[in-house]
Amino acid sequence: MKRRTARERAMQALYQMDITGELEPKVAVENTLDEGEETNEFLESLVVGFVDNKEEIDAAIRQNLKKWKLERISIVDRSILRVAVCEMKYMEEIPHNVTINEAIEIAKTFGDEESRRFINGVLSNIKDTL
């Protein structure tokens, strides 16, 4: 599984967990996989990394939102931001610009017309604080 695919699957897993409010991370990851597709370590580390550090990740996002509340952001955009911030804060071997570019590409696929600019702005602000 390519890293872009793993990031997309992680975003989808966080989306499911956000909607249901009670889905276990392992189940959410399994729900994103195609039939016969296996998970990988990167995907699982993104999802578990978010679950283990949810308060810190959400706080970093909240501190960099202008005129928005985290709860008012679309679930898709919130999930993309959470995956990207998890990667930026806890996977130091991945350059922040790569993470931001990947998040923008995922936003182009899954978000609305404003998503990519919004996500780019928030993540760029977070990058400056790390």
From Swiss-Prot:
It comes from the Bacteria. Pfam families: NusB (PF01029). Transmembrane segments: none annotated. One of its GO terms (cellular component) is cytosol. GO terms for molecular function: RNA binding. Keywords: RNA-binding, Transcription, Transcription antitermination, Transcription regulation. InterPro entries: NusB-like_sf (IPR035926), NusB_fam (IPR011605), NusB_RsmB_TIM44 (IPR006027). GO terms for biological process: DNA-templated transcription termination; transcription antitermination. PANTHER family: ANTITERMINATION NUSB DOMAIN-CONTAINING PROTEIN (PTHR11078:SF3), N UTILIZATION SUBSTANCE PROTEIN B-RELATED (PTHR11078). Belongs to the NusB family. Involved in transcription antitermination. Required for transcription of ribosomal RNA (rRNA) genes. Binds specifically to the boxA antiterminator sequence of the ribosomal RNA (rrn) operons. This is Transcription antitermination protein NusB. The gene is nusB.
